[in-house]
């Protein structure tokens, strides 16, 4: 039953997202950092958190006070499934950009939100491209973005 509810919510989320892509695109023309921040807030508060709630997931975070809030950091999430990604993202501070495998960059709506949130896509089969991706991480870190 929960699967059906989550699927229905994802459909509703996709419908609501369509006009927001345009709105956030326009915002990004004037302030790219504002677009990234608002995109992260929307995806987190109206995407990931409700999906976790509807799925019956309850998170308990210990040591949140140890998470850096005002300086750049690199977080590495060791995840085995998609829910680990949702749980990790909802606990990360803003602004946070993520590194994801390049295959996720081919999923239409997901890749758009990830690009809006300054996420990077990593080709795990090409070592040179992977090193190039990691060298681009330096730029967001110098702008006080968190990287996960």
Task: Identify the meaning behind each predicted range.
Residues 1-60, 112-113:
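A transmembrane-helix-recognition feature enriched in membrane-embedded lipid enzymes
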Residues 54-148:
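Soluble catalytic domains of membrane acyltransferases
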């Amino acid at each position: 039953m929960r699967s059906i509810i989550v699927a229905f919510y994802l459909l509703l989320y996709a419908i609501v997202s369509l006009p927001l892509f345009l709105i956030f695109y326009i915002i990004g023309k004037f302030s790219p950092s504002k677009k990234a921040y608002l995109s992260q807030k929307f995806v987190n508060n109206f995407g990931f958190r409700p999906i976790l709630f509807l799925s019956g997931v309850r998170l308990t975070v210990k040591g949140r006070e140890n998470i850096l809030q005002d300086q750049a950091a690199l977080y590495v999430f060791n995840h085995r499934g998609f829910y680990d990604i949702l749980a990790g993202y909802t606990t990360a501070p803003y602004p946070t950009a993520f590194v994801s495998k390049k295959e996720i960059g081919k999923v239409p709506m997901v890749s758009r939100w990830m690009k809006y949130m300054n996420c990077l896509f990593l080709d795990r089969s090409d070592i040179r491209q992977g090193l190039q991706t990691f060298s681009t991480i330096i730029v967001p870190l110098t702008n006080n973005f968190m990287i996960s």
